[in-house]
Design a protein with these regions (language model features):
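Conserved helicase ATPase motor motifs in RecA-like P-loop NTPase domains
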Residues: 103, 142-158
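SF2 helicase/translocase NTPase motor core
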Residues: 1-137, 158
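A short helix-turn-beta junction within AAA+ P-loop NTPase domains corresponding to the substrate/partner-engaging
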Residues: 162-169
Length: 169
């Protein structure tokens, strides 16, 4: 808490922070709710589109499962009591985000109508979801120019891994 308060009140050109500490800095509850509602709306639209196509029953079931998971996250967020003494990511005044070792965030869920495609993750890592939400916020305040990802690890598994990294940016 003290470290985040110093970042928020200080006049720093750069702050270097480890991944584990970065993940502990939450987005505001309101922003998390709005982003989850956007994701639920997107998947609802995709479900309706898949229902209109014939032979997409498996895909619809998978997307319904994802929608249920997102709704559970939203309900959990709504049930949480808010701590007033927590400095949120928005309050830090960050205007540029450089992420080293960005390959650690490759497990971001991707819902799609395609089936049996190698590398499409059916699970979602919390740290990846957190980074995705923070990147969406950075896109809002910088016009899509506030994020830089760096890694020395080559794309190894599939094109979906590259697509996932590009979704952040």
């Amino acid at each position: 808490k003290r470290f985040c308060s110093r970042i928020a009140t200080g006049d720093y050109d750069a702050v270097i922070i480890g991944h584990s500490q970065f993940e502990k800095i939450p987005l505001s509850r309101e922003r998390q709710i709005a982003l989850l509602e956007d994701q639920i709306a997107d998947i609802t639209y995709s479900i309706e589109a898949a229902k209109e196509e014939t032979g997409q029953q498996y895909t619809v079931k998978q997307m319904e499962k994802t929608k249920k998971t997102l709704k559970a996250k939203l309900e959990k967020l709504n049930d949480q009591t808010r701590k007033d003494d927590v400095v949120t990511f928005e309050q830090l005044g960050v205007d540029r985000l450089f992420v080293d070792e960005s390959h650690y965030y490759k497990n971001l869920f991707l819902y799609t109508k395609m089936r049996n495609v190698a590398g499409i993750s059916q699970t979602d890592a919390q740290k990846s979801s957190d980074m995705f939400m923070k990147c969406r916020y950075m896109d809002e305040i910088t016009g899509g120019k506030g994020i830089t990802f760096a890694t020395g690890t080559p794309v190894s598994n599939s094109m979906t891994e590259l697509y996932t990294i590009m979704r952040y940016l």
